[in-house]
């Protein structure tokens, strides 16, 4: 996907990482990716870099619900998300692994947020970032919103859902973000 760090060729990524590490104030690398962008070359690069500096990989899962993933046009499945996390953890044991989730998809329920926490608990994840699904101007979602086909979660409902998620999340998983 365009705008995903790992969309570039691995050789280009490695070059960019090397340039970043030349700066004395850079203390590590945070790499954003998607489940469908994890290749053996990516794993090799992460493992190599993690031997030299702190490396965190942030995986944009967004949801474990297949219908919501299709609606979001993510192009990957929940099973691919789980597999990618497990691959990174196994191939790159020194890498700090985080996941991003978005709350507010159509027909999403509180029970789905609790289920997401349980699924994350079963994975080798170190941190999580939560996002509220919002409407951006000039997007297909903006058109759905304008036609009354999509309504974002109210702020209070979103934070209640976050609280439910957090109540079920393993206490050793750091929460890096509650809203974006």
Question: In which residue ranges do the predicted regions lie?
Answer:
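Conserved strand-turn element in the central/C-terminal portion of the radical SAM core barrel
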Residues: 60, 64-68, 88-112, 131-137, ...
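A structural motif corresponding to the C-terminal end of an alpha-helix
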Residues: 23-26, 87-97, 123, 161-173
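Aromatic/hydrophobic pocket-lining residues that form the small-molecule binding cavity
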Residues: 13, 81, 109, 113, ...
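Distinct, well-ordered alpha-helical segments
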Residues: 9-18, 39-50, 113
């Amino acid at each position: 996907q365009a705008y995903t760090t790992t969309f570039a060729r691995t050789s280009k990524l490695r070059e960019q990482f090397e340039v970043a590490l030349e700066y004395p104030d850079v203390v590590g690398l945070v790499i954003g990716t998607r489940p469908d962008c994890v290749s053996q070359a990516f794993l090799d690069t992460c493992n190599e870099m993690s031997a030299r500096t702190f490396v965190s990989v942030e995986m944009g899962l967004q949801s474990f619900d297949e219908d919501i993933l299709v609606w979001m046009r993510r192009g990957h499945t929940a099973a691919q998300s789980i597999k990618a996390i497990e691959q990174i953890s196994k191939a790159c044991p020194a890498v700090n692994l985080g996941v991003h989730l978005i709350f507010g998809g159509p027909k999403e329920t509180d029970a789905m947020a609790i289920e997401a926490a349980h699924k994350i608990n079963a994975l080798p994840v170190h941190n999580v970032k939560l996002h509220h699904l919002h409407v951006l101007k000039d997007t297909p979602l903006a058109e759905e919103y304008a036609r009354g086909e999509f309504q974002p979660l109210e702020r209070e409902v979103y934070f209640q859902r976050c609280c439910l998620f957090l109540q079920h999340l393993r206490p050793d998983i750091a929460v890096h973000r509650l809203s974006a």
